């Protein structure tokens, strides 16, 4: 009899797309700028909605946003905005569409300054993943001090729709933090060679801790 796989408590066991994301992507360190930009776009669009909604619309987002090529997205104009707002395959929110285009331009500025966005991004955790030891869904904070500090710098640089909660979700997604629960099989895979770091959690005002 096959032994049941132990996972984090948040991915629905009857949702193959969600499980695939948890098992193969979430928390894996990302150093590729295009993939980083993809997650920044998706995280900003997810704000206020479920991540499941974004996952199921991800292929449509990829097509609508030029395969997440920041240089191409940065050149989007009024006609592109109109096109995106008529695209039923994505989340049609004008503010978020405009924010994605703005963020593409800011993304390019960071690349120009640091060489790659990844180099800038990873500097916020000392260029190596932070390994937490969450045991239950209640342990997850909505954001940490690192997320607050980075969100503040992103705002200073002109990024939008990237507050501390969204930024922390991004940090979890791209592996800046290993936030799989300690009993999850992915925690052990991703934790190899990474020391545990005690991180001060900031639950904000009435924030409710969640995983993904």
Predicted segments, located by residue:
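HhH-family (HhH-GPD) DNA N-glycosylase catalytic core used in base-excision repair
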Residues: 1-212
């Amino acid at each position: 009899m096959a032994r049941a796989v132990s996972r984090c408590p948040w991915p629905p066991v009857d949702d193959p797309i969600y499980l695939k994301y948890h098992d193969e992507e979430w928390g894996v360190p990302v150093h590729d700028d295009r993939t980083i930009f993809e997650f920044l776009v998706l995280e900003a669009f997810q704000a206020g909605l479920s991540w499941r909604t974004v996952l199921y619309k991800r292929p449509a987002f990829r097509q609508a946003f030029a395969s997440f090529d920041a240089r191409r997205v940065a050149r989007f104009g009024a006609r592109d905005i109109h096109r995106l707002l008529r695209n039923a395959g994505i989340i049609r929110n004008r503010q978020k569409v405009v924010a994605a285009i703005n963020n593409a331009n800011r993304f390019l500025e960071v690349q120009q300054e640091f060489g790659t966005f990844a180099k800038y991004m990873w500097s916020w955790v000392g260029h190596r993943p932070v390994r937490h030891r969450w045991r239950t869904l209640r342990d997850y904070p909505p954001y940490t001090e690192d997320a607050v500090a980075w969100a503040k710098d992103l705002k200073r640089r002109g990024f939008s729709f990237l507050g501390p909660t969204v930024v922390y979700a991004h940090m979890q997604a791209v592996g800046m933090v290993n936030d799989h629960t300690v009993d999850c099989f992915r925690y052990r895979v991703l934790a190899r060679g990474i020391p545990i770091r005690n991180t001060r959690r900031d639950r904000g005002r009435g924030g409710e801790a969640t995983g993904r």
